[in-house]
Amino acid sequence: MNTKFPITAKGFKKLEHELKHLKHVERKKISEDIAEAREHGDLSENAEYEAAREKQAFIEGRIKELEDMTARAEIIDICKLSGDNIKFGATVTLIDDDTEEEVTYVIVGEYEADITKKRVSIASPIAKALIGKSVGDFVEVITPKGLKSYEVVTVEYKELDL
């Protein structure tokens, strides 16, 4: 898959950090674990060896995944963005039409999304509904709880705390 995907600079650094850790720390550690397990004799009935090999396969798979992700990443510096229209990286404050409650979301890449921190993926229904809108606009979003309507109150572009 060669499709580029947007990611914040901080999000990209987190991916790079994880990749570096897996390559230089975890890969070495698992090799040592495998060597130690081999010393315990018959590999056909060696649970430690099998567990270490499974962990090695997982680590190698994650390394490949992270290498692919970092190669396809389109790094976007949110601090350099501005404007009234909502796009990737926007911190958007909305008012729920039904409850009058205020909620703030940040539109981020899919690998940075974390709903507990109000960071929503650019591919999510709420982000798709918000893209291109500006302050004063109303948006409708189909959620698991049904159709929700919001008014856009503020649009900001500021540094994220990942």
Curated annotation (Swiss-Prot):
UniProt-recorded Gene Ontology molecular function terms: DNA binding; RNA polymerase binding
Superkingdom of the source species: Bacteria
Protein name as it appears in the record: Transcription elongation factor GreA
UniProt keyword DNA-binding, yes or no: yes
Gene this chain is encoded by: greA
Keyword Transferase: no
Function: Necessary for efficient RNA polymerase transcription elongation past template-encoded arresting sites. The arresting sites in DNA have the property of trapping a certain fraction of elongating RNA polymerases that pass through, resulting in locked ternary complexes. Cleavage of the nascent transcript by cleavage factors such as GreA or GreB allows the resumption of elongation from the new 3'terminus. GreA releases sequences of 2 to 3 nucleotides.
Similarity comment: family membership: Belongs to the GreA/GreB family.
HAMAP family, alphabetized: GreA_GreB
